[in-house]
Amino acid sequence: MNAFLAAMVRHGQLADALQLFDSSCDRDIVSWNTLLAGFARHWCVQGWILWRRMVREVVGADGFSFSTVLSGFAASASLASGLQVHAQLVKSGFGDDVYVGNSLVEMYMKNKCLADGTRAFTEVRRRDVVSWTEMAAGYLHCGEPAKAIGVLSDMMLDGVMPNNFTFATAVNACANLTNLDEGRKVHGYVIRLGDDSDIGVKNALIDMYAKCGSVSCAYKVFQSMQQRQVISWTAMIMGFARNGRAREALEVFDDMLLKGIAPNYVTLICVLYACGQGGFVDEGWIYFNAMADKFGVEPVEDHYACMVDLLGRAGHIEEAEELISRMPFRPGVLVWQALLAGCHLHGNEAAGRRAAEHALALEKNDPSTYMLLSGMLAGRHNWEDARRARGLMTDTEVMKLPGSTWFQSTLDRNQACIG
């Protein structure tokens, strides 16, 4: 029965697997763990129901069971359920299992419980490379990139060699800090100790060098890759675009298409952004209009926001407003902020006020809208209204985010697909 169960789980036939499981009279711990692992891979409420059923039927969970269910709660960011399992773990006697300990660290860190995650890490007696990598990834996830980088040296002092996942995490932390010196150090470790051909590490290096302003180094890494994923091409396109080399970004995209690589929706966000940075209005329209028919990607709000930004930067405010009016769904905050940014740039106060009204009606606590509105009004020497806009920020207790823009929020939401 377990062999059939494993085959069903492997092929994603979870409903059939559960039916077979329920109809069987000779279930053992392997049966439970197999089904639990299947639900953990696509974690949903059924996984939690199965775990509670396992506890209720007094099935003796083992280390694999605890590790699996904790990883599931890490993936679903379900802290309350994870705490219940941790309490059961304490009574079980499997607390010393390194796999269970690693999953416990992962569960706390992905729920942004840094202190609890650190405590769980210190209680892992025989830490392996997964333990340290989970800790580095946890620090990064919790907004502590400097500590994530520090894990790399700490683990080597502890006699544990990093793997490619550790290196990629450390490189991403350097990118987060835009710390080129640390990024180069980590790259040196990769060359000496790791697999310099690993695609994931190289993707992270491209993103890091580009974010640190060393796009030539990013391109060298890109050129050295024997195999490239869509993420690789996307990271390089974005690297050129964000460093003022929009034409080269589009040349990379053209090369991507010539090699038969299909772009995804994030790639096309970066292509449209590159058009905006370069002022390539006609090309932007060509790419935007070809999205659905040629690339099989239906434009979403991020793509419309990029097109509005492109038109706004070029001073085509009326054309941008006309595009917004033709959107097949309700424009979101990003679209109106993109229009407001264009109005700020070209001093179109009337359209800018309209854009700000729409943006604030949708999200009154977004600092970007207030800053763009205030900047536009100040640029028109409308000091009183500019002060009033800043006063509204204070009245609504909006915190100014340094360097925050509508496009940065787009990148933040899609970062997993870029770097």
Question: What residues fall within each predicted segment?
Answer:
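Terminal (and in a subset, N-terminal) low-complexity or junction segments at the ends
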Residues: 1-419
